[in-house]
Amino acid sequence: MRKFTIVLLSLLISANVVSQTDVKDTYNVLVDNTGNISLPKEYRQNWTFLGSYFVQSAPTPTGETSHDMHTVYTQPYAVTHYRKHGNFPDGAVLIKEVNATKTEPLTTGLASYQDAPKVIFAMVKDTKSRFAGNAAWDEGWGWALFNPGDPKSQTTTWKGEGLNNCFGCHIPVKANDWVSTQGYKSVLGK
């Protein structure tokens, strides 16, 4: 019985460590030896919520717009490091969920809130240029796009087409290490 308890406890601790994925473990747990990025498990429960953006799309030719909620998470140590040094450490992972929104009148007023997931993005900090031959890695980051429910990245190049064009959205924040941080000041402190 004692042996069973020790084995069970070890498995539970191991599962918890894998789900939390500290920055020191990123390249052992979330990134394979060729640079393929996996979506971390349970990041909503174990990582730090950085903030949200409510984003209205540009009007389509028919004048329609959509509204999305962008919600961002990272590992707790990445926040501690950022507060101290003003940058994300090697192995930091930023996860951005893009969700559709619903809007309805509530007793407190007209409210918009996140609804169905549309896509999930990940950025993995790489200060050592580990994957120079992989087009999904450039400018000090690994870039990934995940469809909801699929832990396999759809990104083959960070300068791809459509939603896989990470470069197009991040070029305005190139001077800020390619990250939009203005919505995270209450957490990051800078």
Tell what function each PLM region has.
Residues 1-4:
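Positively charged n-region of N-terminal signal peptides that target proteins for export
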Residues 6, 10-11:
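Small-residue packing motifs within transmembrane alpha-helices
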Residues 14-15:
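N-terminal signal peptide c-region/cleavage motif recognized by signal peptidases
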Residues 21-24, 31-32, 39, 43-48, ...:
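Sequence context surrounding c-type heme c attachment/ligation sites in exported
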Residues 29-31, 35, 80:
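Short, functionally important structural connectors and interaction interfaces within domains
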Residues 49-72:
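Secreted/periplasmic proteins
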Residues 66-83, 106-108:
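N-terminal post-signal-peptidase region of extra-cytosolic proteins
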